[in-house]
């Protein structure tokens, strides 16, 4: 991660210095090439397995594939720390966690006084902005404009912290809202005399994978294939056996699979109630109308053992895929905007995630163990 991040920092900043000599007919003249704009899209927990330009077994991601088709797809991109805040700190600084000081999500506050990628870009003449997830505790530095979600953010009716340190609520689904704000900044708020670098940072596809309402029924008829090692026994691997990421044992029946009933309890039930409590009354009716038949069927069947593990896996995969669908839509909106404005050929579009994720491999979800599915991340530009 250090090698990739630091070299990327310098290569992005270096575009401001690019010049080219062109010829037109018989007349030769030197023209200064405008520095490339940069749109850096980062998502949370989006694993390469769930992008069709990397893996065709699961879903189609046509807009993400557009970036790969017209650019470069990195097949060996790995993070230095597969945890949201620490991974982002590595990205911005080009330093490993022990060197940048942000080693975990619970006790650390990012030191914004150190050198970062956006600061280098500012020095190179860029206008910089970040919109969406920040997750570094301190307020952003090195940005001319920012508006960030507090903590993990809310999928529904999301809250944002403004540059005035006010917390406001915006209407809609977070992935759409972040894109709306990003397009508005590019169209109406930036200095159009300067090159820009916009970091579009999504909460998606972070746990607990709450879908956009229009996609609630998507993938419900799809049966996702089980990974070959779904029933891993962890023989000879005590550390792996001790992990608390088991789909069967650790995936919360209410918070993660949405099998919510007031007379049932789970460790994360209250958090789930807070999340879906952000829906408007008319939205909650749509949400409940979809999940209530699933809930009734689940508690009637009351699956156990392998049947429960595979049922949880299918619910997990379907909800995760639905959130990816909204994300892919919004990547398409950004690409379409740049194309419509005649900016696409002069803009470097980067898409990546802060880490990978287990999609049932080793019987797991989450990312907190150092196997490839956790450390490997998609990177296209």
Task: Cite the ranges covered by each PLM segment.
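Formylglycine-dependent sulfatase
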Residues: 2-16, 21-381
């Amino acid at each position: 991660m250090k090698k990739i991040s630091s070299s990327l920092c310098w290569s992005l900043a270096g575009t401001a210095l690019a010049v080219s000599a062109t010829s037109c007919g018989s007349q030769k003249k030197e023209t200064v090439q405008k520095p490339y704009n940069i749109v850096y899209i980062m998502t949370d927990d989006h694993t390469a397995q769930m992008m069709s330009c990397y893996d065709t077994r699961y879903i189609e991601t046509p807009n993400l594939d557009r970036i790969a088709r017209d650019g470069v797809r990195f097949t060996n991109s790995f993070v230095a720390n597969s945890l949201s805040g620490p991974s982002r700190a590595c990205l911005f600084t080009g330093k490993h966690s022990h060197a940048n000081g942000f080693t975990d999500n619970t006790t650390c506050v990012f030191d914004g006084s150190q050198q970062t990628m956006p600061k280098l870009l500012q020095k190179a003449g860029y206008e910089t902005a970040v919109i969406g997830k920040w997750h570094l505790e301190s307020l952003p530095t090195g940005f001319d404009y920012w508006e960030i979600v507090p903590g993990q953010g809310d999928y529904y009716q999301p809250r944002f912290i403004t540059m005035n340190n006010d917390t406001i609520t915006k209407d809609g689904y977070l992935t759409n809202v972040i894109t709306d704000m990003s397009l508005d900044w590019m169209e109406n708020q930036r200095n159009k005399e300067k090159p820009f670098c916009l970091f579009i940072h999504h909460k998606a596809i972070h746990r607990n994978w709450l879908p956009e309402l229009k996609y609630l029924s998507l993938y419900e008829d799809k049966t996702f294939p089980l990974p070959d090692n779904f029933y891993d026994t962890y023989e000879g691997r005590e550390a792996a056996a001790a992990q608390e990421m088991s789909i069967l044992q650790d995936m919360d029946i209410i918070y993660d699979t949405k099998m919510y009933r007031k007379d049932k309890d789970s460790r994360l039930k209250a958090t789930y109630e807070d999340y879906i409590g952000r829906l408007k009354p008319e939205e909650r009716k749509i949400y409940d109308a979809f999940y209530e038949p699933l809930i009734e069927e689940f508690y009637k069947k009351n699956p156990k053992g392998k049947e429960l593990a595979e049922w949880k896996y299918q619910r997990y995969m379907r909800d995760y895929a639905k959130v990816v669908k909204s994300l892919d839509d919004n990547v398409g909106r950004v690409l379409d905007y740049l194309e419509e404005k005649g900016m696409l050929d002069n803009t470097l579009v980067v898409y990546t995630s802060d880490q990978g994720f287990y999609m049932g491999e080793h019987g797991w979800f989450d990312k907190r163990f150092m196997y490839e599915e956790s450390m490997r991340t998609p990177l296209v530009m």
